């Protein structure tokens, strides 16, 4: 249920690429950083990583134990965590709920499995935190430490908020609520609201990492208002710039730059839904013919035919596929569904189109939540991610559903562009602990 990666290998490859580009382009002055949000690595007092990367896909916060208790709960709340003991917090047994549900009930906070502090709570309760660990940060924060020789992490608010237990209005961690869950403030990394200078690497200024959602928005939309960024990768995501803080079920107000927010909604399956369908078709073809080849080109043709067929149907005769195959952040137990299935639409063409339409509709419903709560109107749509770049029919569906023209982002690696921009506009004053 945990989703882990080799943090040292990731950083080694990133540093090798950095060296390659610095050798090739001699005029580089600044290095901006970004990477996957939510996940964490543990750091020791010398600034060295002492754990794998626990990614955003970690599902342990949704687990229940066999005896019906919260799976985040220890039988003995005073088990040793490294060399220390939890000696001030008495954790009550809670019957039949997951750690996520326990947090919601006890702290009145909505968070999600895979968020860094949820992972940390689970690890703490199961004695999984390395004895030498003193704090944690994102993988890109750790890269910044390795490049500059920092011994303590500095986390931009765009990443700090992705850990959960974060007050986006006050731009600080919810320390009292963390205490209720047994987390001491000493674990929390230092945070910054501006993109601060971390230090230098090969005479280049290295700046604090920003979240990949914020970097993608900055690299494709910039600071434009009324422009919706639709990203379709493994997951799906919408983001739009706001001067005001707004949150509701499924919508987060993520700290951006210049005290603004990105109102964001994310689907857990997204482009993965289309990949699941391709794998389904591919398995059948392999059994029938012995051939095992990608079928995306064929599926594109089928999607076009399915779209044409769907346009001729009455609304109550149109195939509807809910692509929540991995649940949602609000309802992780939710599954997908197929409705309005009739003999004339029980076809590969309708299923292919139906999955694409379902992927888009899940994001559109999130936008409706934003619009109803803020009156923000979408006038332009910027598309990013291979799910859109490689699927003309999906682009057409998004345009028709959202009622605006979709323009693909100029640069394919939008987050990398955004990271570079963040480095160029950052406050070069070094943070106090650099």
Pin down the residues of each PLM region.
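Active-site core segments that coordinate phosphate-bearing ligands/cofactors
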Residues: 62, 71-110, 117-152, 164-175, ...
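Short loop/turn motifs at secondary-structure junctions
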Residues: 27, 184-187, 360, 377
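Short beta-strand-loop/turn "lid" adjacent to the catalytic site in phosphate-handling enzymes
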Residues: 23-56, 106-114, 144-168, 192, ...
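Short, conserved acidic/polar surface loops in the N-terminal third of protein domains
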Residues: 42-46, 66-68, 241-242
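A conserved helix-loop-beta module that forms one wall/lid of the active-site cleft
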Residues: 178-196
């Amino acid at each position: 249920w945990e989703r882990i990666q080799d943090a040292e290998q990731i950083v080694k490859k990133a540093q090798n690429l950095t060296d390659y580009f610095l050798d090739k382009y001699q005029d580089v002055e600044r290095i901006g950083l970004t990477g996957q949000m939510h996940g964490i690595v543990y750091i020791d007092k010398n600034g060295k990583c002492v754990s794998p990367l626990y990614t955003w896909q970690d599902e342990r916060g949704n687990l229940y134990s066999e005896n019906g208790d919260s799976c985040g709960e220890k039988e003995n709340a005073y088990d040793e965590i490294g060399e220390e003991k939890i000696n001030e917090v008495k954790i009550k047994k809670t019957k039949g709920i997951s750690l996520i549900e326990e947090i919601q009930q006890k702290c009145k906070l909505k968070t999600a499995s895979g968020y860094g502090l949820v992972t940390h709570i689970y690890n703490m309760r199961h004695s999984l935190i390395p004895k030498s660990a003193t704090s944690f940060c994102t993988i890109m924060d750790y890269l910044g430490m390795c490049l500059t020789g920092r011994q303590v992490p500095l986390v931009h608010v765009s990443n700090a908020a992705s850990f959960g237990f974060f007050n986006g209005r006050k731009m600080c961690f919810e320390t009292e609520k963390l205490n209720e869950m047994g987390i001491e403030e000493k674990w929390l990394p230092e945070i910054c609201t501006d993109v601060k200078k971390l230090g230098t690497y090969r005479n280049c200024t290295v700046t604090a990492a920003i979240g990949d959602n914020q970097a993608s928005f900055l690299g494709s939309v910039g600071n434009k208002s009324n422009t919706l960024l639709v990203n379709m990768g493994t997951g799906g995501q919408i983001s739009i710039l706001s001067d005001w803080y707004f949150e509701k079920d499924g919508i987060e107000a993520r700290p951006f730059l210049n005290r603004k927010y990105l109102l964001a909604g994310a689907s857990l399956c997204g482009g993965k839904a289309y990949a699941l369908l391709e794998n389904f078709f591919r398995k059948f073809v392999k059994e029938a013919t012995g051939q095992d080849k990608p079928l995306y080109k064929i599926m594109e043709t089928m999607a076009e035919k399915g779209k044409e067929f769907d346009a001729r149907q009455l609304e109550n005769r149109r195939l509807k596929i809910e692509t929540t195959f991995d649940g949602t952040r609000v309802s992780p137990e939710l599954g997908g569904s197929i409705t309005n299935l009739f003999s004339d639409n029980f076809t590969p063409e309708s299923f292919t189109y139906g999955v694409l339409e379902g992927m888009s509709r899940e994001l559109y419903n999130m936008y409706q939540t934003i619009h109803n709560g803020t009156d923000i109107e979408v006038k332009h749509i910027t598309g990013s991610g291979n799910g859109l770049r490689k699927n003309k029919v999906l682009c057409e569906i998004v345009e028709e559903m959202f009622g605006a023209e979709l323009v693909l982002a100029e640069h394919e690696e939008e987050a990398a562009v955004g990271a570079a921009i963040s480095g160029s506009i950052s406050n070069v004053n070094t943070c106090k602990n650099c």
